[in-house]
Amino acid sequence: MKTSKVMTAKEAVSKFVGDGMTIGVGGFFHAISYVITHEIIRQQKRHLTICQPSFNEHADQMIGAGCVDRIVSSYVWMEVFGPLHCFRRAMEKGIPHKIEMEDYTNFAVMARYLAGALGIPYIPINSMKGSDMMNYSAWMGENKVKLVQDPFGSGKEYAAVPALTPDLGYFHVQRADEEGNCQMWGIWGDSPWSMRACKEVIVSCEEIVSRDIIGRDPNRTILPGYKVVAVVEAPFGAHPKHTQGYYDVDRDFIFKYIRESQTQEGWQKFMDEWVYGVEDRVGYLKKYVDTYGMKKFLDLKASDMSSSSVNYGF
């Protein structure tokens, strides 16, 4: 019997995100779920460990809001847009409180997720060998990474990293059905493996479609519904990042955040206006249109570049 998992972001976060959880965050600049991130902040979840190969300002906002105690990642930065100031304040000054970061390479975090998704306890990699990352650990100690010999006799040595299996994951996709079968195209990043490694997953999507539409294009299904506990329909749910086929990156808005968050007071003003001051994503988008105008909003929408159709018959 089909079971609908559709609910609001508020309901999903309230029901499935608990204090002290280890949370996997999907997306790689593309299709990052700000609708869930902002709801976690509004509900004041605490003592979270957040995991992602590379973090952007979604992590910075959770850190500034006091949600995060620990990070598993390779960096927390905003690419060409500049540094993330809440992360630096927390690491350097303990504002709002001190946080810890277990520092891996980008690939090593991905490999840990891969091991978790495959159900194996660890995975050997070439990454990290010979670097200071082998010598430093925030809280995992000797269990962060270990050198292992090739058991098949080559004599080669590898860095073995443990499987990463977060309590919960969340990510954003273009479309999903009511049962949680998720389809994504464009930059996948870590999402196919990180979300499989998580024990449960909340998915936000641009639109909910029928099971028939999902079934007609199975190769785009990157996560099956049995992993998903909640489906949140949220158009523009990844703004200010992009979602391919729906809207582009809002560079001006990202620069605005980087600029205003340079001071604690500026960051608080931004958050009061764009996160705490709106009830949900609908309110967020309404405020955006009221502030910047409908033309600016519509200019973000993606141009049409449709893929060729394929024949699945046999």
Where are these regions (language model features)?
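Conserved alpha/beta enzyme-core scaffold
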Residues: 1-314
